[in-house]
């Protein structure tokens, strides 16, 4: 039920969700919040006989920041037996080939969510055994959140990584994480959206972990910046949305390669075979 409501809220500019027992918390920029739209949505939910109540309040960025810095101690996450993601104060951190430190500060991308975890696994496979590693390998990470995907790509061998995040506070968090991992010389973090693309730079690999509506709206920009034979990996949508994503990508000249899903969250991979 929570997944259905989250999917219906996404077009209303809600981009982050968390569930606690019988409560769904949804987050959107304050200037995008519309109580009338939320009320209309809840009045039309396809759940008969179920009563919903809701409330809203504005969350101060500094409060979240302080809370995370003081309390977050998430368990280390192991991805594909090769990558360990952990916080600054995580305990019992195992040794892995790729060690990544993340201070999430409420930004999306600690590696816990199915979309992030699956993309991390795909990045490991993309660079497996030195494959695709070269002095010219470039990666674009759209909607980078904590920049964990960009950081792993750089760790695996990408020589140049560009990470773009629309939220200025989240972009600052991404920059902090890049510095924490000693990758300031490899990763450039910018605040903005797909309008920053199209400057002539081409990428071997484009990662986009956002949401269905943004992916559909901006996919042409991602593809325009791919090198010949480049790879596009997208996530942030449900498995039932795959036909829509696939149709859009193929209409733009991309070749569908494969997809995978975990708890209905899906990653789709396409190739710009020219």
Residue spans for each PLM region:
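SAM-dependent Rossmann-like transferase core, predominantly class I methyltransferases
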Residues: 63-133
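N-terminal auxiliary segments of SAM/dcSAM-dependent transferases
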Residues: 2-94
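Conserved SAM/SAH cofactor-binding pocket of Class I
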Residues: 106, 110-198
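S-adenosylmethionine
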Residues: 121, 129, 166-273
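A short hydrophobic/small-residue beta-strand
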Residues: 16, 160, 232-233
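Class I S-adenosyl-L-methionine
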Residues: 6, 10, 39-46, 69, ...
